[in-house]
Amino acid sequence: MSKTISFKTYSAKPGEVERKWYVVDAEGKVLGRLASEIATILRGKHKPQFTPHVDTGDFVIVTNAGKIGLSGKKLDQKTYFSHSNYPGGVKIENLKDMLRKKPEKVIEKAVWGMLPHNNLGRALFKKLKVYAGPEHPHVSQSPVEMKVNQ
């Protein structure tokens, strides 16, 4: 008798997804490479049960956001653009000022650009926790240290 092989595609259901917590130390890491690794974990693409239309990702805590590494002349040349939708409401801020004022925002903007820009992407983004210093208040979730390759 021959074996029966199931050719059905597996689709994860929101209730059966198990979520883990990861902590990443951003000190000295290159911004774009770190952001792409974080986006992969948030999306759940590292899991075999990844389903594109279901939130299968894990939580990510990023510490030492103020000590992120950058390549080239990005510290002086990279700018962030925003507009308030009012006439003359353009706000342009360079990376050096943003790292000084709110270093968490730099990593958040980099990761947000790598997530889908829809309802699912907004739900995924809520699972990202970024802190400027080495401390974070999520010790009770017992996060696992995540190694990011340089």
From Swiss-Prot:
SUPFAM superfamilies: Ribosomal protein L13 (SSF52161)
Transmembrane segment boundaries: none
One of the Pfam families matching this protein, by short name: Ribosomal_L13
One BP annotation, GO: translation
One cellular component term from this protein's GO annotations in UniProt: cytosolic large ribosomal subunit
Keywords, sorted A to Z: Ribonucleoprotein, Ribosomal protein
Domain of life: Bacteria
GO molecular function: mRNA binding; structural constituent of ribosome
InterPro entries, sorted: Ribosomal_uL13, Ribosomal_uL13_bac-type, Ribosomal_uL13_sf
Family, similarity comment: Belongs to the universal ribosomal protein uL13 family.
Purpose: This protein is one of the early assembly proteins of the 50S ribosomal subunit, although it is not seen to bind rRNA by itself. It is important during the early stages of 50S assembly.
Quaternary structure annotation from Swiss-Prot or TrEMBL: Part of the 50S ribosomal subunit.
Protein name, as recorded: Large ribosomal subunit protein uL13
